[in-house]
């Protein structure tokens, strides 16, 4: 490449468009003295606009927009941000809970209608970003978050009501459940026909092969708007964020005897697109409530999503210095027991699973599928083949007789997703009588394996995976944060006044990845001092038992708790026009047949 066009400058980031696809225009008011005459001829500058109500752009408009995903994020920042967290904490006091059994200690009457139970779920990528920023371990970053959200020196130290978060969960636990159910889903598609109903009791059929992962909301939003033909291939499982929301809302609602609207769930994620996911109408209590009132307003399973950078803004707004918080676990006096002790042991297990480098930084969906089928086929081995770039990798599980058992792949970044979509695009029917159907033509279709050869594909919108999410702490923010903290690692961070070079940005992402993978060694050291780690098949039994207990205790089928649906999204821009008059229809017809007035 030339010095001007360098591979270091390639990036999938799309800056938000300067013009909205549905702009709000200010037009002069119509003269009420004039009446409409469909046959009146006038000049363009004399046309009076209708007196319409003020235009509003809602989240629904953004979800139905045919523009890029990033344009919607700018609107969502104002709808789900650290300011909303502060406003909610100030508007609603915490419901007092018994520190012995986790039950509500006051009568639920008119006086306490404003009370809320605040819960939070935090992704491991967020902890890795904080650990790299402040030069601490992943475990210490976990302590920092808990002290900030629930401790006496964090959010509870200020605000109108001194409210904080009663329970803070690690999404790794729910991710483990999704991984096990994903392997089950892949196994079902390998042994049954595509149109067969799922054995989990879901009313919908199994996804088509290859199954495409559905945990990345940027990828899902893109598929629903642009390539609806891939929707039958999407995994029906909820993401760990969505599953955590359903888990909290169902268990606490039934155990505490309060409606889901009085449980406020915050998710801290590495990605702005998680705000889009939380706003989906499929991820509300309407999807799992057995008996719904006609006047019932759907309540989100995840009420608000903030990113890692927004958590820094949240702390700054309250005047809290995150690195000055105690880097140790909270005393049990600040954490009441979860109402259901069986689910408490599941959700707050002492050794939450970490991630190995082989699993990647996006949850390890593909890695778990391969490991599961390898455990079910003793003597088999995994053969890895790198694709056109580092974000495309193909895997083949070979039996002891060197015959392929399963093929899978990993596609990160929209550049590579385009190639995957081309492989899955249905063949075009020939317009000539008796002609053969024509396969799609493209670079992605001409090279590599056919998309239908895969049993499972892990798809993520961000190049490099979720540790490189758009909401993560950037190197510029890390420089500013570390410059105010006197630590032994402050010398490793370059001068905050200089613009980071591509090499420095890659080095920063490597530090975040290192912190992310370090969680595995912490988990292993803890587990080694207590008991031997569970095998994959033992983990499957543990997860299946927990999911079965959750479903039975709630009286809700697992198909409603852990699975979701997708839909084709069409742009509604320009479609909400008033019904055309007879004159308009005649004019349109005349224009189509070449006539006129």
Curated annotation (Swiss-Prot):
Residues 428-449, 479-505 are annotated as: Disordered. The keyword Transcription regulation does not apply. This is Cytosolic Fe-S cluster assembly factor nar1. GO terms for biological process: iron-sulfur cluster assembly. Belongs to the NARF family. Keywords: 4Fe-4S, Iron, Iron-sulfur, Metal-binding. Component of the cytosolic Fe/S protein assembly machinery. Required for maturation of extramitochondrial Fe/S proteins. May play a role in the transfer of pre-assembled Fe/S clusters to target apoproteins. [4Fe-4S] cluster 1 binds at residues 20, 62, 65, 68. [4Fe-4S] cluster 2 binds at residues 216, 271, 462, 466. The keyword Iron-sulfur applies. It comes from Aspergillus niger (strain ATCC MYA-4892 / CBS 513.88 / FGSC A1513). Gene3D superfamilies: 3.40.50.1780, Fe-only Hydrogenase (Larger Subunit), Chain L, domain 3 (3.40.950.10). One of its GO terms (molecular function) is 4 iron, 4 sulfur cluster binding.
């Amino acid at each position: 490449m030339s010095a001007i066009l360098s591979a270091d400058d390639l990036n999938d980031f799309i800056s938000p468009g300067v013009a909205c696809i549905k702009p709000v225009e200010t037009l002069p008011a119509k003269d009420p003295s004039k009446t409409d005459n469909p046959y009146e001829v006038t000049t363009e500058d004399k046309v009076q606009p209708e007196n319409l109500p003020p235009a509003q752009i809602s989240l629904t408009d953004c979800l139905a927009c045919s523009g890029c995903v990033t344009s919607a994020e700018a609107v969502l920042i104002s709808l789900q941000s650290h300011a909303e967290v502060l406003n909610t904490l100030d508007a609603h006091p915490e419901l007092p809970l018994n520190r012995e059994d986790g039950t509500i200690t006051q009568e639920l009457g008119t006086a306490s209608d404003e009370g809320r139970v605040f819960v939070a779920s935090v992704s491991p990528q967020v902890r890795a970003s904080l650990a790299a920023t402040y030069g601490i371990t992943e475990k210490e970053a976990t302590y920092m978050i808990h002290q900030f959200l629930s401790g006496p020196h964090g959010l509870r130290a200020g605000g109108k009501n001194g409210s904080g978060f009663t329970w803070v969960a690690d999404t790794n636990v729910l991710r483990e459940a999704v991984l096990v159910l994903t392997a089950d889903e892949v196994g079902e598609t390998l042994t049954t026909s595509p149109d067969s109903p799922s054995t989990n009791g879901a009313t919908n059929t199994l996804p088509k092969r290859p199954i495409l992962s559905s945990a990345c909301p940027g990828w899902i939003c893109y598929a629903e708007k642009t390539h609806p033909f891939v929707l039958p291939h999407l995994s029906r499982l909820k993401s760990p964020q969505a599953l955590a929301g359903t888990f909290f809302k169902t268990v606490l609602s039934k155990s505490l005897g309060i409606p889901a609207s009085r449980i406020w769930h915050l998710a801290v994620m590495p990605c702005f697109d998680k705000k889009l996911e939380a706003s989906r109408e499929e991820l509300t209590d309407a999807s799992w409530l057995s008996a719904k009132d006609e006047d019932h307003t759907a309540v989100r399973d995840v009420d608000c999503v903030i990113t890692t950078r927004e958590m820094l803004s949240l702390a700054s707004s309250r005047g809290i210095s995150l690195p000055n918080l105690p880097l140790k676990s909270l005393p049990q006096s600040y954490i009441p027991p979860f109402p259901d002790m069986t689910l408490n042991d599941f959700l707050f297990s002492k050794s939450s699973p970490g991630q190995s480098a082989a699993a990647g930084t996006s949850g390890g969906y593909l890695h778990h599928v391969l490991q599961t089928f390898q455990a079910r086929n003793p003597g088999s081995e995994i053969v890895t083949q790198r694709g056109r770039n580092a974000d495309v990798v193909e895997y083949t599980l070979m039996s002891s007789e060197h015959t392929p058992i399963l093929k899978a792949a990993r596609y990160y970044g929209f550049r590579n997703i385009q190639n995957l979509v081309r492989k899955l695009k249905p063949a075009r029917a020939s317009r000539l009588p008796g002609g053969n159907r024509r396969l799609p033509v493209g670079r992605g279709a001409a090279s590599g394996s056919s998309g239908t050869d895969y049993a499972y594909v892990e798809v993520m919108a961000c190049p490099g995976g979720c540790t490189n999410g758009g909401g993560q702490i950037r190197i510029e923010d890390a420089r500013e944060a570390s410059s105010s903290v006197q630590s032994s690692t402050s010398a490793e961070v370059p001068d905050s006044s200089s613009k980071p070079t591509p090499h420095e940005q890659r080095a920063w992402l490597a530090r975040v990845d290192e912190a992310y993978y370090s969680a595995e060694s912490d988990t292993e050291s803890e587990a080694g001092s207590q008991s031997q780690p569970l095998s994959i098949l033992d983990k499957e039994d543990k997860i299946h038992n927990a999911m079965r207990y959750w479903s039975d205790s709630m009286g809700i089928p697992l198909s409603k708790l852990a699975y979701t649906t997708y839909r084709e999204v069409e742009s509604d821009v320009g479609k909400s026009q008033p019904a055309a008059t007879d004159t308009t229809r005649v004019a349109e017809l005349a224009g189509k047949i070449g006539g006129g007035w």
